[in-house]
Amino acid sequence: HVHSFSRGATHTDVGDDNQVAEALAAVEQKEGHIDYVINTAGVLNREPLASMEYDTILKAVQTNYMGTVNVALRARPYLQRTRGKLIFFTSSSYTRGRAFYSIYSSTKAAIVNFVQAVAQEWDADGISINCINPERTKTPMRQQNFGIEPDETLLMPERVAEATLRTLLTDCTGQVIDVRRPAAGK
């Protein structure tokens, strides 16, 4: 069974450690176990750093980075019992900071380093932890920040979901899984 939590639908904020703990406990109580945890939460505020309100910066770091830490720490005991898998999401901007989204790019880079480090720490516990790195994807967050773009220039969310599911079926850990648009004509 799949359980979904979000700020909009369930008022669950990954930046709030207690809310993460409550969400995971509710799933474990209902299902008896947790095999996989996938965290896609992210905030992109596309504006110059010098123009950003400090509270906006803190909220982005709290969601993007501390949300990752919260989910990992709170999911760990459940995933230890099932030798489960944990997936986080980065962005192609993690490899090179980009003007007007310095906080987003830097928190996404931090997620990659976090995943690689924690994968080594938790390998003996049987927990796999990986990071999905989709290229520019057609999402509401993207549209909010960049407007309407031609579909052929964007990765479709379904392709990202398929790559995520394929990753759950592997034994890899500590990896960054790049997801790209299919080549023209494929």
Give, region by region, the residue ranges found by the protein language model.
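Active-site loop-to-helix junction immediately N-terminal to the catalytic Tyr of the SDR YXXXK motif
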Residues: M52, G97-S105, A117, N145
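C-terminal helical subdomain
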Residues: A124, C131, T139, G147-K186
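Active-site helix of classical SDR
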Residues: A72, T107
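Residue(s) in the substrate-gating loop at a strand-loop-helix junction
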Residues: S91
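Conserved NAD(P)H cofactor-binding loop of Rossmann-fold oxidoreductase domains
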Residues: T40-N45
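Substrate-binding pocket helix/loop in short-chain dehydrogenase/reductase
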Residues: P48-L49, T56-V61
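Active-site-adjacent segment of SDR/Rossmann-fold oxidoreductases
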Residues: R96, A117-I127
